[in-house]
């Protein structure tokens, strides 16, 4: 009689899209991986990572906003211009809220039978990103990332489709709703600082982004052990399409000054990525961060990014108060759904 794990691996390999978790379980004793996961030489981590150097991404304490907001804004502005990524500490989200989020996500991927996971799979050709899946972007030359994922919206309530929320483990919904509640407070503060840093009123960037209509899209990335982490990537190099992305620490690599670097992260800090839409709103003053995710030979890695996105019909362009004769618009104003279509299909914006 097959074990549940064996059954799950067999099921995952017979699906229309083979799941990386299943491929990992079969290749774990090998010294090779399927060719579609082997990156070109100019992408392979072993060949392109600057070895022996670990970057210290800016760490910003956001607990003292009431005491010295000017200092906080300056730190966030500098990090957003120079790095496009920073870590916030003393953010107010209780450790147990983050731990519960991680616990239920891990249980979904590792304890729920494969057949049950497939019930909430993203349908081929679906317009929405939501659901359990494997491939996302149209990869160059058919190459794939060494990752399975689960997408679903966690805010606002009107945007949530619980069809894509796992029913098991039973505490999944509660853990995610609690995390969303706390995360919104952090996001509001970051939007305010980014707005003030551009010489705008504190509310202007949030309003330009859509205020209460901003969509919080959670993605759980599951990177199983990979026999050849020197050849594969979990997620290919990219910038996020979002306004900002908030995530619990994850071993992403950052491209800075012409090199790929490993980065030092603080446990239970919240990592902030500046995304494409804030770069557009700021007319290029803030920079979206170019990053990628590597994998590990011996252990599973997971991450929980939350992408703060416009609604699909929302139009995003440079904030009008930032535009004048000396600062003409550097980006087109367009509906977010059109931006996403172009980016996922590697078309010019």
UniProtKB/Swiss-Prot annotation:
Q: Which residues bind Fe cation?
A: 238, 240, 291
Q: What is its main location?
A: cytoplasm
Q: Which Pfam families match?
A: 2OG-FeII_Oxy (PF03171), DIOX_N (PF14226)
Pathway recorded for this protein: Secondary metabolite biosynthesis; flavonoid biosynthesis
Q: What do the Gene Ontology cellular component annotations say?
A: cytoplasm
The residues covered by the Fe2OG dioxygenase domain are: 213-310
Keyword annotations for this protein? Cytoplasm, Dioxygenase, Flavonoid biosynthesis, Iron, Metal-binding, Oxidoreductase, Vitamin C
Q: Which PROSITE patterns match?
A: FE2OG_OXY
Where's it found, cell-wise?
Cytoplasm
The cofactor note reads: Binds 1 Fe cation per subunit.
Q: Which reaction does it catalyse?
A: a (2R,3R)-dihydroflavonol + 2-oxoglutarate + O2 = a flavonol + succinate + CO2 + H2O; a (2S)-flavan-4-one + 2-oxoglutarate + O2 = a (2R,3R)-dihydroflavonol + succinate + CO2
Which cofactor names does the annotation list?
Answer: Fe cation; L-ascorbate
- Its Gene Ontology molecular function terms? flavanone 3-dioxygenase activity; flavonol synthase activity; L-ascorbic acid binding; metal ion binding
Q: Which GO terms describe its biological process?
A: coumarin biosynthetic process; response to molecule of fungal origin
Record's signal peptide? none
What is this enzyme's EC? 1.14.11.9, 1.14.20.6
Which family does the UniProt entry place this protein in? Belongs to the iron/ascorbate-dependent oxidoreductase family.
Role played = Catalyzes the formation of flavonols from dihydroflavonols. It can act on dihydrokaempferol to produce kaempferol, on dihydroquercetin to produce quercitin and on dihydromyricetin to produce myricetin.
PANTHER family in the record: OXOGLUTARATE/IRON-DEPENDENT DIOXYGENASE
Q: What is this protein called?
A: Flavonol synthase/flavanone 3-hydroxylase
Source organism of the structure: Solanum tuberosum (Potato)
């Amino acid at each position: 009689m097959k074990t549940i794990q064996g059954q799950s691996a067999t099921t995952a390999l017979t699906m229309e899209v083979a799941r990386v978790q299943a491929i990992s379980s079969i290749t774990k004793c090998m010294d090779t991986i399927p060719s579609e996961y082997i990156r070109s030489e100019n992408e392979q981590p072993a060949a392109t990572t600057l070895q022996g150097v670990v970057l210290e991404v800016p760490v910003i304490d956001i607990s003292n906003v009431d005491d010295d907001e000017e200092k906080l804004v300056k730190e966030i502005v500098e990090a957003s211009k120079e790095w496009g990524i920073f870590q916030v500490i003393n953010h107010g989200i209780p450790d147990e809220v983050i731990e519960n989020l991680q616990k239920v996500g891990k249980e979904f991927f590792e304890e729920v039978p494969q057949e049950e996971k497939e019930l909430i799979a993203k349908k081929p050709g679906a317009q929405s990103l939501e659901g359990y899946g494997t491939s996302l972007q149209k990869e160059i030359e058919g190459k794939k990332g060494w990752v399975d994922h689960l997408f679903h919206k966690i805010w606002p309530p009107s945007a949530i489709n619980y069809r894509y929320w796992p029913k098991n483990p039973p505490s999944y919904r509660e853990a995610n709703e609690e995390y969303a509640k706390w995360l919104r407070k952090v996001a509001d503060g970051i939007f305010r600082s980014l707005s003030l840093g551009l010489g705008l009123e504190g509310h202007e960037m949030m309003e330009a982004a859509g205020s209460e209509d901003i969509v919080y899209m959670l993605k759980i990335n599951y990177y199983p052990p990979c026999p050849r982490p020197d050849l594969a990537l979990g997620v290919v190099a990219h910038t996020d399409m979002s306004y900002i992305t908030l995530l619990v620490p994850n071993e992403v690599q950052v491209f800075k000054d012409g090199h790929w670097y490993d980065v030092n992260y603080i446990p239970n800090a919240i990592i902030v990525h500046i995304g494409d839409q804030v770069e557009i709103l700021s007319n290029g003053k803030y920079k979206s961060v170019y990053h990628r995710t590597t994998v590990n030979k011996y252990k599973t890695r997971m991450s929980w990014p939350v992408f703060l996105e416009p609604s699909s019909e929302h139009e995003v362009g440079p904030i009008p108060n930032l535009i004048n004769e000396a600062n003409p618009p550097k980006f087109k104003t367009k509906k977010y759904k059109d931006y996403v279509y172009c980016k996922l299909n590697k078309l010019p914006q």
